[in-house]
């Protein structure tokens, strides 16, 4: 559906929010955002196996987690893989090629965000670009957390400003952006 053009790869390497290695600090910042945005039930969306594992280890099961069994294109270590496999959250399985966003992934993300219980989206392929549609689809006050290779975890507070930045990157991807918004259950201006 959408693919990352070679010309944009560098733009996608820049973190969209602050980077930390401390899950407790990240969770405190997420709670602060929920308070500031008057959104006490705003979800936390984790993109990546290692990020999901660290949040769970810190005592916070992500409301939505997207995992692919890999970190930096290598299989995650056994401890992380076993811990995530043992999680009893509802699971959705999707296919999503590298450097892409498939309709299947976008539809699953929309479905998972509407579920009151935690959902793990198991991705065959890669989930690396999933932070963008997560920012676009999540409610105000949510936090989207993803891994920054070699640095730590990035937390993006979902606000009108972060949605604008995500929208610009999302719409710069190659493919049918209108159909991608439809699969995500959103319209380009961010309304549901």
From Swiss-Prot:
Secretion signal, residue range per the UniProt entry: none
Domain of life of the native organism: Archaea
Reactions catalysed, as given in the entry: 3'-dephospho-CoA + GTP = GDP + CoA + H(+)
GO molecular function: GTP binding; kinase activity
GO terms classed as biological process: coenzyme A biosynthetic process
Keyword annotations from UniProtKB, A to Z: Coenzyme A biosynthesis, GTP-binding, Kinase, Nucleotide-binding, Transferase
EC numbers: 2.7.1.237
Residues that coordinate or bind GTP: 49-51, 68, 70, 127
UniProt enzyme class: transferase
InterPro entries (alphabetical): GTP-dep_dephospho-CoA_kin (IPR007164)
Pathway the protein contributes to: Cofactor biosynthesis; coenzyme A biosynthesis
Entry-linked PANTHER family: GTP-DEPENDENT DEPHOSPHO-COA KINASE, UPF0218 PROTEIN TK1697
Physiological role: Catalyzes the GTP-dependent phosphorylation of the 3'-hydroxyl group of dephosphocoenzyme A to form coenzyme A (CoA).
Family: Belongs to the GTP-dependent DPCK family.
Protein name as annotated: GTP-dependent dephospho-CoA kinase
Organism: Halorubrum lacusprofundi (strain ATCC 49239 / DSM 5036 / JCM 8891 / ACAM 34)
């Amino acid at each position: 559906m959408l693919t990352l053009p070679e010309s944009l790869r560098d733009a996608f390497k820049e973190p969209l929010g602050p980077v930390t290695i401390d899950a407790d600090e990240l969770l405190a910042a997420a709670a602060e955002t929920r308070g500031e945005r008057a959104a006490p039930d705003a979800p936390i969306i984790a993109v990546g196996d290692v990020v999901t594992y660290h949040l769970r280890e810190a005592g916070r099961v992500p409301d939505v987690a997207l995992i692919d069994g890999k970190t930096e294109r290598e299989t995650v270590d056994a401890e992380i893989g076993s811990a995530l496999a043992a999680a009893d959250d509802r699971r959705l399985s999707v296919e999503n090629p590298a450097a892409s966003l498939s309709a299947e992934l976008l539809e699953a993300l929309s479905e998972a965000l509407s579920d009151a219980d935690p959902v793990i989206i198991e991705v065959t392929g890669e989930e690396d670009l999933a932070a963008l549609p997560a920012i676009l689809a999540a409610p105000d006050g949510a936090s989207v957390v993803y891994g920054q290779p070699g640095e730590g975890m990035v937390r993006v507070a979902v606000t009108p400003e972060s949605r604008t930045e995500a929208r610009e990157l999302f719409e710069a991807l190659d493919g049918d952006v209108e159909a991608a918004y439809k699969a995500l259950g959103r319209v380009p201006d961010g309304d549901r």
